[in-house]
């Protein structure tokens, strides 16, 4: 069965319909040798060969000509600052690949991808879990489940965003399954608990390796940065012929939930609850050693013995603490010293990881991106407490997002930001939230830095208000429009009638730069992208497409 989308911007045309039918019945037990380059011919006007940069500002690394830079960093899906059309991707389930390394529910996945193609989405996003791929031992990589997925995505003419997920799955908002770090890594952590982030009371967080040991060979002779780099290099070697084609984007995970931040608000075991301020994560021996060295370097040795003693606990509000209250310690000489170090370490971590990723994927034709968390609670206070504990030095007096945007731009990396769907009026008054103000600040920061901006919704939403907020954000004049939007997440509820119709209308609106109208019940343009058509196609596959 085929879904055709006459107005699609898909670059791929099948050369052999017979092989397409054969691939549809692919077994869940298939194994793959190293994948060969795709056998599709590219026909669109915006093909890799013809595509040009139209950005107002383009970072050119020292020693490289602009022409060479353009060739090495060609866009993988069409969009520019002068093009209002925004491609929409959909996140796949967290357990898309099973713990045994196979594609989960391949028949349902096939039907779901067919439906998404019919809805006009550009592609899908999947997590490449460190805990799955390298679980059998150091540098022993198993990409088989992802190979199955890539072939299936390609068959449907979709694109793929792949997240290099170096964090644990489980224990945070929306986590529906548990995928820990690789067993051999957990073994090293059991021997040396300081390898993971630690709060002031000594609680260890196993979500992600502490950035304090980034350059220390603590993982069986390799540093964490080397381990992450080897993982990414293995991915490039395995899927060489697909990166820059069906694999349009590589998102580099840089912390918990794949975000560049500290795990300051862990939900597991009720440690944190919204809208708590969270806690600083700087008490493993590697972070404490770094803090001490930084304090000594500026002649303030006594400041390096510990983090702030008056910063409260996870569930506190800012005014409950001496550090975060209106005129608190955050605004003192000591507070500025500590936040410069704490946020600086996070920036350094991101810089090292993105530098490595750029070296590995440069010239592949795929975009590189990284994710920054949308921490919107207490944004309307002076200290922005929840942002500070996460590592974003953003206060009434200090812009925390411009340095991040500049660091992303240095490496030619797209900044992917969450909470694009949220409105201020939807938030509880006591939490002093402003997701809209936060998004505007990040838009302005990326515009000022010359960095591309992409977006995600932070929470599972299906209503027109949430979709409308994303559309409004994209066409806002306050800063950068979006280069892409990734919807969270494909599941059973997404395929329900009204929810599905909202998604189809949203995709069309984003393609039209936010100026689209509600979809007609009849097709008068021959686009195959109207409600009646989609409902008919979904009805044929609804049982298979509804992933649990």
Curated annotation (Swiss-Prot):
Region (Disordered) residue spans: 1-36
InterPro entries in UniProt: Glyco_hydro_14 (IPR001554), Glyco_hydro_14_CS (IPR018238), Glyco_hydro_14B_pln (IPR001371), Glycoside_hydrolase_SF (IPR017853)
Biased segments, Polar residues type: 1-11, 22-31
SUPFAM superfamilies from the UniProt entry: (Trans)glycosidases
Subcellular location: Plastid, Chloroplast
Record comment: activity regulation: Redox regulation; active in reducing conditions, inactive in oxidizing conditions.
Role this protein plays: Beta-amylase activity. No alpha-amylase activity. Involved in cold resistance. Mediates the accumulation of maltose upon freezing stress, thus contributing to the protection of the photosynthetic electron transport chain. Plays a role in the circadian-regulated starch degradation and maltose metabolism in chloroplasts, especially at night. More active on phosphorylated glucan. Interacts directly with starch or other alpha-1,4-glucan.
Protein name: Beta-amylase 3, chloroplastic
């Amino acid at each position: 069965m085929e879904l055709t989308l006459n107005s699609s911007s898909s670059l791929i045309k099948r050369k052999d319909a017979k092989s397409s039918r054969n691939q549809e019945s692919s077994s869940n037990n298939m194994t793959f040798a190293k994948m060969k380059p795709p056998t599709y011919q590219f026909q669109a006007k915006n093909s890799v060969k013809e595509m040009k940069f139209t950005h107002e500002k383009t970072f050119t690394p020292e020693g490289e000509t602009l022409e060479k830079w353009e060739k090495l960093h060609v866009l993988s899906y069409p969009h520019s600052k002068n093009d209002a059309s925004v491609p929409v991707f959909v996140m796949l389930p967290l357990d898309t690949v099973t713990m045994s390394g196979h594609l989960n529910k391949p028949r349902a996945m096939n039907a779901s991808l067919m439906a998404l193609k019919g809805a006009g989405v550009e592609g899908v996003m999947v997590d490449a879990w460190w805990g799955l791929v390298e679980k059998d031992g150091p540098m022993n990589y198993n990409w088989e489940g992802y190979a199955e997925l890539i072939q299936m995505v390609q068959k449907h003419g979709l694109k793929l965003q792949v997240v290099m997920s170096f964090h644990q799955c489980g224990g945070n908002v929306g986590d529906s399954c548990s995928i820990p770090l690789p067993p051999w890594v957990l073994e090293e952590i059991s021997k040396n608990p300081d390898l993971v982030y630690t709060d002031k009371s000594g609680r260890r967080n196993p979500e992600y390796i502490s950035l304090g040991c980034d350059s220390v060979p603590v993982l069986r002779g390799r540093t964490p940065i080397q381990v992450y780099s080897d993982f990414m290099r293995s991915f490039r070697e395995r899927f060489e012929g697909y990166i820059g084609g069906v694999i349009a984007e590589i998102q580099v995970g840089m912390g918990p939930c794949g975000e560049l931040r500290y795990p300051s608000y862990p939900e597991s075991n009720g440690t944190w609850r919204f809208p708590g301020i969270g806690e600083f994560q700087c008490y493993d021996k590697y972070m404490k050693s770094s803090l001490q060295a930084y304090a000594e370097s500026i002649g303030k040795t006594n400041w390096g013995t510990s983090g702030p003693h008056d910063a409260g606990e996870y569930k506190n509000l800012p005014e409950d603490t001496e550090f975060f209250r209106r005129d608190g310690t955050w605004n003192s000489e000591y507070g500025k010293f500590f936040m410069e170090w704490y946020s600086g370490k996070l920036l350094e971590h991101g810089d090292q990881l993105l530098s490595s990723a750029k070296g590995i994927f440069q010239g592949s034709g795929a975009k590189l991106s990284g994710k920054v968390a949308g921490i919107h609670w207490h944004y309307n206070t002076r200290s922005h407490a929840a942002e500070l504990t996460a590592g974003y030095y953003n206060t009434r007096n200090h812009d925390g997002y411009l340095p991040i945007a500049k660091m992303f731009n240095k490496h030619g990396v797209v900044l992917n930001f969450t909470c694009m769907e949220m409105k201020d009026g939807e938030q509880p008054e006591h939490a002093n939230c402003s997701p809209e103000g936060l998004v505007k600040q990040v838009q302005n920061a990326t515009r000022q830095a010359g960095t591309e901006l992409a977006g995600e919704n932070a929470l599972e939403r299906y209503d027109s208000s949430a979709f409308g907020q994303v559309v409004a954000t994209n066409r806002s004049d306050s800063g950068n429009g979006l280069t892409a939007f990734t919807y969270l997440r494909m599941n059973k509820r997404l395929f329900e009638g009204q929810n599905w119709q909202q998604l189809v209308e949203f995709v069309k609106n984003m393609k039209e730069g936010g100026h689209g109208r509600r979809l007609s019940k009849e097709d008068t343009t021959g686009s195959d992208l109207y409600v009646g058509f989609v409902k008919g196609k979904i009805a044929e596959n609804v049982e298979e497409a509804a992933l649990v």
